[in-house]
């Protein structure tokens, strides 16, 4: 029989009785009418409808005889004969196609005749199997299914495409064929098509996989192929694939998620919902398994938040009521979920994770494995790192009564004294893993101004300072780092206690700072940060550090950091630099106490180094402490300068005003005009000397800094050039030469902070002592207004200074000398 335009060469001829007179085709459902003639049912019914539509009585198409009725009778015998005839022909067609596919084609591209023959055979197989479901079993038994599967490896795209189409027909509604196709590497071959560049191959492959995934054993094999689920997930979420391909991929994934192993793979590849569905709706054992696997995943932050929102309450419930295995699986999941800020806050605020975590696990008096406490400590550290307000999160379900007859007691929180005491106790009496995480918890709580005071009070009341300091020398690096971070956070609030207790641990700190592991480490940054935050006025600690060689070791390290020769390539370079600058600033605070410190500052070249550090853009703390150190150093210049014989009086005097620079007074060669002796930046710390590396210019540049603290420190350093004990008039000249007068005046006018206003008013008053400047400034109403404002609203000292400045501007009249002397 000719099937859909495909010729069959050896077809058994059809009898005339098999052919419908109307369609001229072999009948499938023959029926007989009143005249005894036989037609295809659909064809004769159509003829009757046309007769009625044309207003004619129904007639026989062959005899044209009018019919009394249009009843038709099935011709059962004829239909049976036709069916047998058709089956014989289809079997012959199938035999020829099978023979062609199984033994006649090697699957290689290049022979067009063989390729065309194979394509015709594939078409015959497809058509026959679509007409007869029984043929699908015959195809399998004769090896055609396997032969078609092998054609998927053909070099001909046409053959590959047709093979994918035919395979889908062969396995549709036939589990035996699906089982057969699932054997060997055919599934792997089909999956490879999902990454093919050709769109049609991808669509046909995913359609075939969708059909195969309806068979449970084959579905399991699909999931077992490496990369299959990833490719399907990618196709299912693709914006470039066709809607059909996306839908088939999604449907295939839904079939695949019947197996736990596939669900885990999907979660690995970002498709979390099947796992969450099992977790939320599964049996208890399934929930535990899903929670356990959830803890093994490396989730993106968005996924962590989604899991926390959907499954957080359930996990907290499992933590409260579950047995030990369930608690462990839940804690693993919570450890992963809590490691982002958004998800941690969801767990705290919506799921209520804190009370069971702390009360039922971490501080539990039951016989829980230490592994669970370690997990709980890690989760707690993650939660604290989220920055949530732990003052408002109670650890108890209900507030306790205070025992006074109805009053309600203060809620227990993570910051309650007894809770902090319990943490400190665990830190000292458990292994390094738990201790490290709890140190991290306390370090996180003390990093917030809102909560640090509670922890400081608890540390003091527990007497745990010595214990915490001992962890600096722990064998485990992580414990050392976390303890250093905690102690550094405590230093601003209990610096004296820490300085007294450090004692022998100072050498350990210095070893940590000086260690060279090929880059800057977190431990180095934390150790030097702690030293830098201890009170700089503690002379005993300064002496200890000096005797231990701390300053001599850190000075060259600071120089290397400035030059960039220490390249950590990480986030710890900046905190290390800031910490070292703070430590080196300490020695400048003690220059008046011991000549050794002065000699060291000279040898180490601290003044030139701090001048260089003023140019460290982006490091406000470094610039701040460098300017502060230069102030301390500059104050020593008048004591260190070597005074020569008195120079000849200058021929005349001029001063740099707001817009021009006067000529400086003549001084002997090599003599500092500000300090009146032989000065240098390195030896006498003089900012005004030519070897100062533009110290004054760099300090002036800092007056425009956005950080008011840096501005104040730079102004304080510059003020040493116009203070008592130096030639202030010459200091004004130096400031003028560096274009520093206008910025000082602008600071006073802007009045950003009270401290800045006080310093600026003092400096302006000193500048206005130079008559030439006072004369010019008198015309600037903004300066006078700023001084009047300081005079009206400043503190007593600032008001006195502003009054003197206004007198320089003749804004306040000069009274009698006697009265003036009393006023001064």
Curated annotation (Swiss-Prot):
Annotated EC: 2.3.2.27
Please state what is observed when this gene is inactivated: Pleiotropic phenotypes, such as reduced height, enlarged lamina joint angles, increased tiller number, decreased panicle length and reduced primary branches per panicle, due to hypersensitivity to brassinosteroid.
Q: Matching PROSITE patterns, A to Z?
A: U_BOX
One GO cellular component from the entry?
nucleus
**Which InterPro entries does the entry mention?**
ARM-like, ARM-type_fold, Armadillo, RING-Ubox_PUB, U-box_domain_protein, Ubox_domain, Znf_RING/FYVE/PHD
Q: Name where it's found.
A: Cytoplasm, Cytosol; Nucleus
Disulfide bonds listed in the record: none
Which SUPFAM superfamilies does this chain map to? ARM repeat (SSF48371), RING/U-box (SSF57850)
| Pathways involved | Protein modification; protein ubiquitination
Kindly provide the PTM information from the record: Auto-ubiquitinated. Phosphorylated by GSK2. Phosphorylation of PUB24 increases its cellular stability.
| Residue ranges of every copy of the U-box domain listed in the record | 13-92
Kindly list the biological process annotations in GO that this record carries: brassinosteroid mediated signaling pathway; protein ubiquitination
UniProt catalytic activity? S-ubiquitinyl-[E2 ubiquitin-conjugating enzyme]-L-cysteine + [acceptor protein]-L-lysine = [E2 ubiquitin-conjugating enzyme]-L-cysteine + N(6)-ubiquitinyl-[acceptor protein]-L-lysine
Quaternary arrangement and interactors, per the entry? Interacts with BZR1, BZR2, BZR3 and GSK2.
Please give the name of this protein.
Answer: U-box domain-containing protein 24
**Keywords assigned by UniProt?**
Brassinosteroid signaling pathway, Cytoplasm, Nucleus, Phosphoprotein, Repeat, Transferase, Ubl conjugation, Ubl conjugation pathway
Q: Where are the ARM repeats?
A: 133-172, 175-214, 217-258, 260-299, 300-339, 341-385, 396-435, 441-481, 486-525
What would you give as a GO molecular function for this chain, any one?
ubiquitin-protein transferase activity
Q: Which gene encodes it?
A: PUB24
What's a Pfam family this protein contains? U-box
Report the Gene3D superfamilies cross-referenced here.
Answer: Leucine-rich Repeat Variant (1.25.10.10), Zinc/RING finger domain, C3HC4 (zinc finger) (3.30.40.10)
Source organism per UniProt: Oryza sativa subsp. japonica
* Keyword Transferase among record annotations: yes
Job description of the protein: E3 ubiquitin-protein ligase that functions as a negative regulator of brassinosteroid (BR) signaling. Targets BZR1, a positive regulator of BR signaling pathway, and promotes its degradation via the ubiquitin-26S proteasome pathway.
